[in-house]
């Protein structure tokens, strides 16, 4: 795979040329951040950064804020420039403005896909607790983990994201990312049941199963001034979906103190 890295003095005219190659799927420029960088450059506080400008297959995929600031100031500055044909480099770049995973997965419903993939990866790694997330130096969820998972499961995630977007538009009782993540978690056992469970959460129907009980809890929570935290709610959803698959009801929907986060084994 071709790579070339060197230090270049970038002039305003070269910066404009590079900015003209930015792909359509790239993030929009954040004017406030550009002004901040421009102010640093104008007062001479700008130094050579280890965060390289990245040109991938002729397009600028990293550095548009810095180059926009350079153009605004109208002066030349040195940059490390990486030229590559490796599209995988886009998934691990780490710029001054935090890149969201949705920027990496530039597809329809990318925001839902990326956030659902993150939730599934965290769930599979055992990083979710009823009270939030848990982290350690060994078991963590990285951007690369999320991108890899999303790319391997893109077709299924895209279908789920499109479905949950339509359902959410009718009755927004459950976040689209949680709904898509539920389908993703349940589909290996029974995709049809997973889709039906999530659909029932939004649209209702029936009064004698776990989907009905969970929908009532979601409606009650959405109307409450004291809402359950998202991790706790996701745990209830997992527990409820497991009961739905088994043809049982969960009874009182809660996670007791000391209880481990629900699984879908």
Predicted features by range, described:
Residues 71-265:
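Solvent-exposed functional surfaces
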Residues 1-84:
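Short alpha-helix boundary/capping and kink motifs at helix termini
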């Amino acid at each position: 795979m071709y790579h070339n890295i060197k230090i270049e003095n970038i002039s305003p005219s070269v910066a404009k040329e590079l900015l003209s190659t930015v792909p359509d799927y790239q993030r929009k420029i954040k004017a406030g951040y550009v002004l901040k960088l421009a102010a640093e450059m104008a007062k001479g506080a700008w130094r050579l950064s280890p965060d390289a400008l990245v040109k991938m297959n002729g397009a600028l995929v990293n550095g548009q804020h810095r180059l926009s600031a350079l153009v605004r100031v109208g002066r030349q500055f040195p940059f490390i420039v990486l030229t590559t044909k490796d599209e995988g480099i886009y998934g691990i770049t780490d710029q001054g403005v935090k890149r969201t995973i949705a920027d990496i997965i530039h597809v329809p419903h990318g925001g839902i896909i990326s956030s659902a993939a993150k939730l599934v990866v965290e769930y599979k790694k055992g990083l979710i607790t009823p009270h939030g997330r848990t982290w350690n130096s060994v078991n963590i969820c990285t951007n690369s983990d999320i991108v890899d998972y999303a790319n391997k499961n893109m077709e299924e995630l895209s279908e789920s994201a499109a479905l949950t977007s339509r359902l959410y538009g009718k009755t927004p009782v459950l976040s689209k990312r949680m709904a898509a993540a539920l389908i993703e978690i349940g589909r290996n056992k029974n995709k049809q049941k997973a889709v039906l469970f999530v659909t029932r959460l939004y649209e209702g129907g029936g009064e004698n199963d776990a989907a009905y009980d969970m929908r009532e809890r979601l409606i009650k929570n959405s109307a409450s001034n004291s809402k359950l935290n998202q991790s706790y709610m996701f745990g209830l959803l997992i527990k409820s979906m497991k009961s739905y698959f088994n043809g049982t009801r969960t009874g009182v929907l809660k996670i007791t103190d000391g209880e481990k986060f629900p699984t879908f084994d």
